Amino acid sequence: MAPLEELRTGAWYGDRSLPLTFPPGWDVSTLNPDTPPPLSDSQIVQAFAHPVGQLPLRLLAAQKERPLVIVDDLTRPTPCARVMPFLLEEFRQAGIKPSDITVLMATGTHGLPRGDAMAKKIGSEAAAQCRLIAHDDTRDVVRVGRTSFGSPVYVNREVPASDLVVGIGGVYPQHSTGFGGGSKLALGVLGRRSITRLHYGHRSAGGSYDIENDFRRELDEIARIIGLHSLISLQVDAGRRPVRMATGDWERFYREEVAFAKQAYKAPFPIDADVVISNAYPIDVSLTFMRSKGVIPLVHAPTHASKVLISACSEGVGHHGLFPFISTSKLDRPRRAARSALARPGNVPQMVAGRIRRKLKTRTGRGSQPTGQAATFHEQRRSSSPIWLYLPEQVSLPDRIPGMEKVDSWPGILDRVAEDQAGRSTLKVVVYPCSPLQVLATDTVDNASLAPPELQDAD
């Protein structure tokens, strides 16, 4: 056996190295992202000193009395703790003590976080000094307006009660809006009614990485309505270390940050691989989020390929209020229709009509059909072979996970692959070391047409 360069696993729960070995005849290619070195202290200071389209935070915060800092939760890999000491210093320069700062964790519908989540996210020192609140989307929300799309905006009451709202978030591929980050941080502090309407009221970007969509436009409106004044945007490398930082007016810098992510994390489709390995780090905290964000390369694996998913699932199944793990495609349809009816009643006939059209096209063969490489990918997606789920740590998960089979050792994975491949000694192996961050793209295939329709939209 020859060792592969080490992967990472267990985001927020150890962030440890994971060495893997392969038989000598296997041709292993690891598709590492092209990211710059981790940020230095001086680079972080400079980012705070030169925000985009705004005064420095120390000036923006002058004369403020109730500042609020919104941070994403542990389902996102954003290392807020790396910049938190510098942020607190900006507030100190404005005459604001840490004890006067409220930190609100934007949990969306993900449920209440574990007791140590805030210390993991912002660092133990900041957690000990600041006032901490975990958002509850079913309580403590107030209505502050309505968007031009007709959605009522319910938000955590701490937001309108504050006189300066600063966010810390990241920029990651996202199924509904193309990319997360920017105004999408606001979604995490909204009430359940607003979140439901957003998810069921818009057509998903469908994994196309296109941020020019109505879901994103409405989020932009909502961020303005709730008063998201300033944003600290971080981009990470495959080891969850921050490598790029932008501060200031998110509307001014967001598209540039997305362009950077698309280029730095661009990776090819596994067109001719015999084995495709997808590492769900750094969004491997739970099964709920790993199953949608970590499987993209596997969805596009060739029919004959063995598919391996690596995920720590440190918090077990996890939770999403709109897209729970227990739902399956057929059982999920009435629930989706009901929620869509609550969000936008006019959507239900469109949903039914769309499903009928898709069934007719499938049965008659009519309608536009993909050609060339796109057709190849669509055919490959029909593979029925299971995904081998490698769990580096012992965690409690359901015995049955649709489409997956759990394997608790790496030698066990190699045995399954060898059996899959009928004992072939020479195999082409493609490894995606941080698949939730990686942007699958080619110069000839339309990403939107390759979006896996069966993916759950957990975000």
Features from the language model and the residues they span:
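C-terminal non-catalytic interaction/assembly regions of soluble proteins
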Residues: R92, S292-D459
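Glycine-rich phosphate/diphosphate-binding loops that line cofactor/substrate pockets in enzymes
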Residues: V52-L68, Q93-S99, A267-D274, A301-P302, ...
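Internal metal/ion-chelating core segments
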Residues: A161-V243
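Short glycine-rich or small-residue beta-strand-to-loop segments that form or flank ligand, phosphate
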Residues: R66-P77, T102-T107, V276-N279
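Membrane-embedded hairpin module used as a gating/binding unit in multi-pass transport
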Residues: Y209-V285
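An acidic, phosphate/nucleotide-engaging active-site surface
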Residues: P113-F179
